[in-house]
């Protein structure tokens, strides 16, 4: 009978992974590294997004301040006088204009971000006509002059203040004797126009065209492009008669017609023309997209886009816009401040990199004995570096991702790739700082490492060559900055060496201080030995045996100081130049002027205004 004996081997002990062990034994260190990387990644990712957002805000303010009259792309075309009268009349009606407007939108494509709600089409007069109605105001005895505008979308962009919206039948022609119209509330108030008023425009080989006002409208968005391309549509103005030595004034305003009433203008002396206004979508403009926008505007004004528009509408179409000039002015301003932004970015980035390197160096210094023991017991540099890399990566990568997410939430509406690259650079540096420092310090295997002594250390030749190279670069950057400034010409953005000048100066200053630091210690060490007591000699000995890596804190501090000082001096110079330019242009902090005599009590009223110290009254004849 056989007997079976079962032999069980003792269970082998499971060794905990390195990363988990390190995180459990030093949670405070891991938390500190995560916090440092998260904050640095947040700042690094927020910087390019903030630059983008400020650039977008500046561009939008530039476009808004330029006014719709300059930024709208306007296509114009005269009536087709060579066509038969029915076709010519039909080409000016609302349906034909809307069809052409749709064709223009298709022809221009998506090269320009357009605000379709504020875009419009219509017919308007070229020559404002003198009104003979005796009830119209005449400030200096001159009759008012009125334009006639038949623009699409009047009902959608206004609300009725009195009366009803004007209507037009579909059979209006150049011989139609009377049509309906409307005026804005400002026009009605200043020109004494009421519902039921009749205005007569001189005819050409026909009786005058009568326009009966059926409604008074109030603009829903007076500052929108719909009303601002031709401001006379909403607000009449007092205009000085050209060439009049007495500077007499007359009122100038506009009457609003329904689009289907446009053919009636062909029988008047107003010289009507068709137009299609494309308003840019200001909220969709981005500062980094200006070169592409300028190319699109140029193509629309006199390029392939204009050719497609002519094929879709009429060969007589022309395009005009000052949007390219507005974009060019903004681009010059952005180019001028680009080097200053680069200086700030280089300075801030250098400080952040130094702080991360300093954190890695401190961590390697605290674990010096541990890492020395690992190398002495057979640990390879590759294995040591890999373990440390995994240890820092498991903390730094999630922290950097958290900082990136926080930056995207804090600064919305900007490009993501640059923020991801900046946060990725922080994560990479946070992961590699400790492994690289440890590998560099423990290349050779040894149980004992020599104690650092600043007073006895002698810089190596490689360090001397590196320092001299940095010194040469710093001198070249400073000389270039002093001779030609931050940019080389009106279209330059400044080279990176010039932008690095404050950082290089800080690096050289830190290296010089580190070089000079041992000299007073050596000079004081020998006299201190003759002193009574142990405090003085021991203090000097302790200072002399300090770590030689003190260059990193010095570099961080000096870089921050030099960058801040450079930025402060630039801002101060810009403020002084702005004040000086304003003073030379205006002659004072503010100036009130008019072609006519100002009210006699205006000076006293201005003098009583808060913040006004003195008022000078002057007359120029």
Q: Where are the regions a protein language model picked out?
A:
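Hydrophobic alpha-helical transmembrane segments that constitute the membrane-spanning cores
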Residues: 347, 390-415
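Membrane transport/envelope proteins' first extracytoplasmic loop
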Residues: 1-350, 486-499, 512, 582-590
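Cytoplasmic membrane-interface regions of multi-pass membrane proteins
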Residues: 367-374, 381, 436-456, 518, ...
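N-terminal Sec/SRP start-transfer signal
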Residues: 1-44, 452-470, 514-563
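Alpha-helical transmembrane segments
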Residues: 346-353, 414-434, 494-511
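Juxtamembrane segments of multi-pass membrane proteins
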Residues: 485-621
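C-terminal membrane-exit region of the final transmembrane helix in multipass inner-membrane proteins
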Residues: 403-463, 472-487, 514-515
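Interfacial "coupling" helices/loops that link adjacent transmembrane helices in transporter permeases
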Residues: 354-393, 453
């Amino acid at each position: 009978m056989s007997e079976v004996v079962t032999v069980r081997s003792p269970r082998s002990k499971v060794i905990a992974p390195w990363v988990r062990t390190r995180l459990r034994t030093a949670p405070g260190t891991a938390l500190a590294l995560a916090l440092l990387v998260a904050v640095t990644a947040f700042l690094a990712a927020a910087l390019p997004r903030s630059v983008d957002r400020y650039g977008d805000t500046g561009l939008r303010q530039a476009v808004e301040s330029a006014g719709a009259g300059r930024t709208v792309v306007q296509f114009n075309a005269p009536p087709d006088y060579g066509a038969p009268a029915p076709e010519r009349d039909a080409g000016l009606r609302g349906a034909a204009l809307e069809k052409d407007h749709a064709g223009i939108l298709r022809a221009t494509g998506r090269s320009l971000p357009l605000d379709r709600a504020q875009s419009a089409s219509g017919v308007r007069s070229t020559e404002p006509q003198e009104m003979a109605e005796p009830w119209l105001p005449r400030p200096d005895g001159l009759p008012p002059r009125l334009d006639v505008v038949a623009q699409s979308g009047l009902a959608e962009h206004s609300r009725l203040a009195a009366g009803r919206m004007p209507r037009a039948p579909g059979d209006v022609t150049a011989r139609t004797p009377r049509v309906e119209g409307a005026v804005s509330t400002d026009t009605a108030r200043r020109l004494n126009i009421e519902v039921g008023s009749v205005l007569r425009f001189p005819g050409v080989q026909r009786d005058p065209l009568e326009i009966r006002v059926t409604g008074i409208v109030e603009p829903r968005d007076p500052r929108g492009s719909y009303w601002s391309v031709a401001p006379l549509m909403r607000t009449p103005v007092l205009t000085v008669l050209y060439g009049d030595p007495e500077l007499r004034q007359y009122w100038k305003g506009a009457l609003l017609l329904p689009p289907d009433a446009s053919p009636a203008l062909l029988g008047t002396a107003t010289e009507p023309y068709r137009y299609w206004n494309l308003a840019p979508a200001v909220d969709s403009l981005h500062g980094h997209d200006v070169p592409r926008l300028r190319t699109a505007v140029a193509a629309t004004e006199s390029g392939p886009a204009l050719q497609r528009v002519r094929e879709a509408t009429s060969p007589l179409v022309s395009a005009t816009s000052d949007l390219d000039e507005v974009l060019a002015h903004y681009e010059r301003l952005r180019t001028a401040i680009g080097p200053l932004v680069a200086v700030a970015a280089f300075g801030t980035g250098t400080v952040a990199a130094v702080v991360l390197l300093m954190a890695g160096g401190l961590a390697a210094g605290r674990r010096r004995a541990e890492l020395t023991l690992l190398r002495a017991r057979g640990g390879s540099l590759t294995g040591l570096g890999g373990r440390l890399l995994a240890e820092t990566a498991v903390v730094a990568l999630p922290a950097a991702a958290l900082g990136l997410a926080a930056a995207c939430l804090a600064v919305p509406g900007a490009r993501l790739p640059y923020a991801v690259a900046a946060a990725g650079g922080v994560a990479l540096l946070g992961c590699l700082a400790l492994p690289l420092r440890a590998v560099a310090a423990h290349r050779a295997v040894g149980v004992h490492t020599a104690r650092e002594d600043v007073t006895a250390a002698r810089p190596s030749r490689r360090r001397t060559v590196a320092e001299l190279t940095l010194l040469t670069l710093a001198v070249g950057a400073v000389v270039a900055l002093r001779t030609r400034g931050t940019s080389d010409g009106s279209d330059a953005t400044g080279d990176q060496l010039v932008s690095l000048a404050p950082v290089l100066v800080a690096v050289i200053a830190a290296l010089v201080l580190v070089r000079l630091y041992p000299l007073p210690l050596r000079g004081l060490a020998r006299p201190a030995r003759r002193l009574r007591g142990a405090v003085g000699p021991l203090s000097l000995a302790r200072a002399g045996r300090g770590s030689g890596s003190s260059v990193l804190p010095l570099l961080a501090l000096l870089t921050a100081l030099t960058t801040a000082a450079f930025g402060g001096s630039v801002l101060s110079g810009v403020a002084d130049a702005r004040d000086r330019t304003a003073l030379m242009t205006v002659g004072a902090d503010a100036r009130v002027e008019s072609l006519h005599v100002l009210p006699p009590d205006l000076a006293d009223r201005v003098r009583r205004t808060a913040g006004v110290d003195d008022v000078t009254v002057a007359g120029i004849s």
